[in-house]
């Protein structure tokens, strides 16, 4: 089995922990991101999704587990945020990413999806498409991109859904894609549902590594209960 085939096999039917703290938060340091990653692996995660060069370098020093690397940018002339430039591809590879993920949506972009894929492939890394719909995913699949993520489903529209897009997972899996289900998988039951729907692996982020979000969910539920009690009287 080749190294790349072995890497693919490691992720199959597994949990990928996305260790991306809220930007500027108390947890947003490379050392803490690396600690999060190690804790996730200790809990059974088979891979990691890490944003930013310094974070990837810190995680790579701490573990040899598979890393999906991304760089997020806010561009003035494009809504594409995830790994938009060719230079990002080179930097991610040099930092230690095993898999390079990039936006494949049909939006105005500084570099074509095909060019990003070719550059990532030239580094020797595996590739992952962050798709928003079936058309994005199939285009990426036909290019030869190794993994198709549902990462951006619901995030290219005005109102973001609350539930994950299991239908897209099924569509892509039936088309022969290695699907990494991602986006709003906030419970073990939803992660299991993604595997049942045909996902190759499942990425979970906020529900594992964003304490602010998790606490917010609990607080909102408590407040809702309090409101309901008050209306009873």
Curated annotation (Swiss-Prot):
Record-level GO cellular component terms: cytosol
Pfam families per the UniProt record, alphabetical: NanE (PF04131)
Single Gene Ontology BP annotation: N-acetylmannosamine catabolic process
SUPFAM superfamilies attached to this UniProt entry: Ribulose-phoshate binding barrel (SSF51366)
Record keyword Oxidoreductase present: no
UniProt pathway: Amino-sugar metabolism; N-acetylneuraminate degradation; D-fructose 6-phosphate from N-acetylneuraminate: step 3/5
Protein's UniProt keywords contain Isomerase: yes
Superkingdom to which the source organism belongs: Bacteria
Gene3D superfamilies cross-referenced by the UniProt entry: Aldolase class I
GO molecular function: N-acylglucosamine-6-phosphate 2-epimerase activity
Annotated EC: 5.1.3.9
Keywords for the protein's UniProt record, in alphabetical order: Carbohydrate metabolism, Isomerase
InterPro entries (alphabetical): Aldolase_TIM (IPR013785), NanE (IPR007260), RibuloseP-bd_barrel (IPR011060)
Known catalytic reactions: an N-acyl-D-glucosamine 6-phosphate = an N-acyl-D-mannosamine 6-phosphate
Xref: NCBIfam families: PRK01130.1
PANTHER family, A to Z: N-ACETYLMANNOSAMINE-6-PHOSPHATE 2-EPIMERASE-RELATED
Functional description taken from the UniProt entry: Converts N-acetylmannosamine-6-phosphate (ManNAc-6-P) to N-acetylglucosamine-6-phosphate (GlcNAc-6-P).
Family: Belongs to the NanE family.
Protein's UniProt name: Putative N-acetylmannosamine-6-phosphate 2-epimerase
Gene, per the UniProt record: nanE
């Amino acid at each position: 089995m080749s190294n790349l085939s072995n890497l693919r096999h490691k992720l199959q039917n597994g949990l990928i922990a996305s260790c991306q703290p809220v930007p500027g938060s108390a947890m947003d340091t490379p050392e803490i991101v690396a600690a999060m990653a190690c804790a996730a692996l200790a809990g059974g995660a088979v891979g990691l999704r890490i944003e930013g060069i310094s974070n990837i370098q810190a995680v790579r020093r701490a573990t040899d587990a598979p890393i999906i690397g991304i760089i997020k940018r806010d561009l003035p002339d494009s809504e594409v945020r995830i790994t938009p430039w060719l230079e990002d591809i080179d930097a991610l590879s040099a930092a230690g990413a095993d898999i390079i993920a990039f936006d494949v949506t049909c939006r105005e972009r500084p570099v074509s999806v095909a060019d990003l894929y070719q550059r990532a492939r030239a580094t020797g890394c595996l590739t992952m498409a962050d798709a928003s719909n079936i058309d994005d995913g199939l285009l990426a699949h036909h290019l030869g991109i190794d993994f198709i993520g549902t990462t951006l489903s619901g995030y290219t529209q005005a109102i973001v859904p609350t539930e994950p897009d299991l239908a897209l997972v099924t569509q892509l899996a039936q088309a022969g894609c290695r699907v990494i289900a991602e986006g709003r998988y906030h419970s073990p039951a939803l992660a299991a549902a993604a595997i049942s729907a045909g996902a190759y692996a499942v990425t979970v982020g906020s529900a594992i590594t964003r304490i602010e979000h998790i606490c917010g969910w609990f607080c909102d539920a408590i407040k809702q209960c309090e409101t309901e009690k008050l209306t009873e009287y």
